[in-house]
């Protein structure tokens, strides 16, 4: 079942010939496989894969152990987010990561992305959840600052700059992955803020703006497309399935607006 065809996606925007491994048997030779059929009720809502993973570990007798417990891993993750946190004149953003320079010294990149690899909005939501659970005010303040800072990336047509450092550019391509993450996470963050007694209607407005643009420009031929010029609203790439990232955004925003025409 491990097949990619008709082409294989092997690098950024690069396709190569299909990946389709085969087993060749000599005359008279045989091969056998074992398979397991698993039934049951998911331990966690919408996460049945957790059952499959636990059963696989049990029956395949996996002996590997986590080097750290889940709490240590979570704390290490938030520590890394602290390292990514960048103060700029407009507020707070998260760097996309660290890369080696010409001397192979890892330095923080001055590249800030709302979703996809940068995940500014998602990390902000995780910090809000951590505050709600453990009362860490530093995480609350950082999350709110990140989300409020990114409001400056919004455009009048409902879209937004997906790279903060590109604000003010005469042309900016926004892909559906970033826009989908942005809208979905802003809707979730609005929901969490409401539960914490924080009034952040502009967060929900950001999600509504993106979703409204997508619904207005939906095409039966290419769905939501892949990428759009955020300033003109013209679609520059309509191929592929990246537009599917808009679906979670629509669902999360609908939960708050109850408006099927959001």
Where is each model-derived feature located?
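Well-ordered alpha-helical scaffold segments within catalytic/enzyme domains
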Residues: 121-137, 181-199, 234, 244-261
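Low-complexity, Ser/Thr/Pro/Gly-enriched N-terminal "stalk/linker" regions
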Residues: 29, 42-114, 138, 142-145, ...
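Solvent-exposed loop and edge beta-strand segments that line ligand/cofactor-binding
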Residues: 13-24, 102-120, 166-181, 226-245
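Short, flexible helix-adjacent loops and helix caps
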Residues: 23, 44, 132, 155, ...
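P-loop NTPase catalytic cores that bind/hydrolyze ATP
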Residues: 29-31, 118, 122-125
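Beta-strand-rich recognition/accessory modules
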Residues: 1-64
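Extended ligand-binding clefts on enzyme/binding-domain cores
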Residues: 68, 72-75, 149-152, 159, ...
